[in-house]
UniProtKB/Swiss-Prot annotation:
Reaction catalysis annotation: a sphingomyelin + H2O = phosphocholine + an N-acylsphing-4-enine + H(+); 1-O-octadecyl-sn-glycero-3-phosphocholine + H2O = 1-O-octadecyl-sn-glycerol + phosphocholine + H(+); an N-(acyl)-sphingosylphosphocholine + H2O = an N-acyl-sphingoid base + phosphocholine + H(+); 1-hexadecanoyl-sn-glycero-3-phosphocholine + H2O = 1-hexadecanoyl-sn-glycerol + phosphocholine + H(+)
Protein's gene: Smpd2
Keywords linked to the UniProt accession: Hydrolase, Lipid metabolism, Magnesium, Membrane, Metal-binding, Sphingolipid metabolism, Transmembrane, Transmembrane helix
Marked site positions, Important for substrate recognition: N180
Needed co-factor(s): Mg(2+)
Active-site residue numbers: H272
Name of the protein this chain belongs to: Sphingomyelin phosphodiesterase 2
Superkingdom in the source lineage: Eukaryota
GO molecular function, one term: metal ion binding
Length: 422
């Protein structure tokens, strides 16, 4: 690769709010989105909440000349809602479904039925290997009483691990999506500290868009004040994150958001605002010690995030075990009731009552058993994430105590990882 190598990458990201039968003005919004993407001709368009495969096929056909490669990530019952459109050939595609996706009995929230996931596409651009990830994490339905907090932390860790272990051959890593987390939330900090990804909004040289980069704003006609909760001026939960390995330099030249309306038509594309980033990748000769200046501070931030995540996952484990125990007792009670009904049915006096109560009792046992098994699985999944975090925390703390150099967010570690692959 030439030393004067330079690559400009234009990226588009949007949570499309494309829910069949529920989302307003779907057909019109999809048509205008397709027109806009054709007009702008981005290198990559990464979309979330496209829960109608028919709408994906419509966009794929409409964008086929501008974006010849496209992929729809299928998972769960409803689907992940993730899809990508690329001007460049997609070399590889991988999908990973998160282990924890909410609760099946919270059917009115729907996250469990979607099978929230992360999609990876590998592109080769002028000799450079780009790993682009698109994801959508579990929604936050209540800031004050967030029953899914542990699930979202576990998803953030799973996402960070997936990126860490699949990006070792990549020169540039790009993550776009709706993380459903504010910039300073634990999951967001954990993700950025472990992967070394940088926030385009923080790093950009030129920003134009909604105040504070918010991606849900009150002036959007599809957003209600209830959606914003205690943040009346808007929230920033959609992101463009990126990094480059040693030997390359990446920066965000411009970042734009829509501001509650379509730039050309006036009405919004979605209840979320779109993100449009222009990234510049250049060849950069490796420095002698590119990370030593900030290594200690970054390790301290990582250790802090890992400790907090371990604590929150511990709370989630305790809660899951409590629910499993409760429904285990209910299941035992139901089985005891069935035994009693069998005894009563053997006699003449209470046979009709026993027969009448038999079906509800069987339903109680089956329902309680299903919920018991789900929470047992939830507890084990949270324990697995906590054990992984504890292992990384132990290793990182030992490294800090020995005064050794960087954790995986630093470039020298990534060089070592890449060397091992060769």
């Amino acid at each position: 690769m030439k030393h004067n190598f330079s690559l400009r990458l234009r990226v588009f990201n949007l949570n499309c709010w494309d829910i069949p039968y529920l989302s307003k003005h779907r057909a019109d919004r999809m048509k205008r989105l397709g027109d806009f993407l054709n007009l702008e001709s981005f290198d990559l368009a990464l979309l979330e909440e496209v829960w109608s495969e028919q709408d994906f096929q419509y966009l794929k056909q409409k964008l086929s000349l501008t974006y010849p490669d496209a992929h729809y990530f299928r998972s769960g019952i409803i689907g992940s809602g993730l899809c990508v459109f690329s001007r460049h050939p997609i070399q590889e595609i991988v999908q990973h479904v998160y282990t924890l996706n909410g609760y099946p009995y919270k059917f009115y929230h729907g996250d469990w039925f979607c099978g929230k996931a992360v999609g990876l596409l590998v592109l080769h651009l002028s000799g450079l290997v780009l790993n682009a990830y698109v994801t959508h994490l579990h929604a936050e339905y209540s800031r004050q009483k967030d029953i899914y907090f542990a699930h979202r932390v576990a998803q953030a860790w799973e996402l960070a691990q997936f990126i860490h272990h699949t990006s070792k051959k990549a020169n540039v890593v790009l993550l776009c999506g709706d993380l459903n987390m504010h910039p300073k939330d634990l999951g967001c900090c954990l993700l950025k500290e472990w992967t070394g990804l940088r926030d385009a909004f923080v790093e950009t040289e030129d920003f134009k868009g909604s105040e504070d980069g918010c991606t849900m704003v009150p002036k959007n006609c599809y957003v209600s004040q209830q959606d914003l909760g205690p943040f009346p001026f808007g929230v920033r939960i959609d992101y463009v994150l990126y990094k480059a390995v040693s030997g390359f330099h990446i920066c965000c030249k411009t970042l734009k958001t829509t501001t509650g309306c379509d730039p050309h038509n006036g009405t919004p594309f979605s209840d979320h605002e779109a993100l449009m980033a222009t990234l510049c990748v250049k060849h950069s000769p490796p420095q002698e010690d590119p990370c030593s200046a900030h290594g200690s501070a970054e390790r301290s931030a990582l250790i802090s995030a890992l400790r907090e995540a371990r604590t929150e996952l511990g709370r989630g484990i305790a809660q899951a075990r409590w629910w499993a125990a409760l429904f285990g007792y209910v299941m035992i009670l139901g089985l005891s009731l069935l035994v009693l009904l069998c005894v009563l049915a053997a006699g003449e006096e209470a046979r009709e009552v026993a027969i009448m109560l038999w079906t509800p009792s069987v339903g109680l046992v089956l329902g309680a058993g299903a919920v018991y098994l789900f929470h047992k699985q939830e507890a084990k999944s949270l324990c697995r994430a906590q054990a992984e975090i504890q292992h990384v925390l132990t290793r990182t703390t030992e490294t800090q105590d020995l005064g050794s150099e960087p954790h995986p967010t630093h470039c020298r570690q990534q060089e070592a990882d890449r060397a091992e692959e060769k």
